[in-house]
Amino acid sequence: CTILPSVAFPLELNHTPKARREERARYLLGPVGLGDVADRYPSQLSGGQQQRVAIARALANNPSIMLCDEATSALDSTTTAQILDLLRRINRELNVTLVIITHSLSVARNICDRVAMIDGGRIVEMGDTEQLFANPQSDILKTLIADAAIEDHRHHDDATETTATEKEQQA
């Protein structure tokens, strides 16, 4: 099926009249930036667009809470930033509480107000995001933050090396 009935499906489950389902689905595609692709098939969309369809479908029944399980895991950094911006707007403008499940510390730090660190099925640390990242108490979070800092440093070094090499080639 195309995107429009996919977004409307939760409304069908709630026995919403067909005309209202289509109207609501078309409306929801606008805020997620897909108003012009309602008649396309999911296979014709990029990964980021497919994620936006899933977000629109999740909003169909006006939830107060939305669970986002690895919402950016298969996306490039530009698309990840766009999806996080969209989720931030949903939280702020629609007053929807977001529960974000992610393995990415940068995603957690970027969008979450509070973080719960889970290790082996147990919460090992929980609190305000900035405080947790500034002063981690658990060994696992300390290690992950240190590893992320090393990785960030590597990316920075790679970018600097590439820039230096490009300048050498231009000379």
Segments from the language model and where they lie:
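C-terminal boundary and immediately downstream tail of ABC-type ATPase nucleotide-binding domains
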Residues: 134-171
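A short, surface-exposed alpha-helical micro-motif characterized by mixed small hydrophobic
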Residues: 108-110
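Catalytic Walker B motif of ABC-type/P-loop ATPase nucleotide-binding domains
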Residues: 66-69
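ABC ATPase "signature
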Residues: 126-127
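Conserved ABC ATPase signature
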Residues: 41-45, 49
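Conserved catalytic motifs of ABC-family nucleotide-binding domains
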Residues: 62
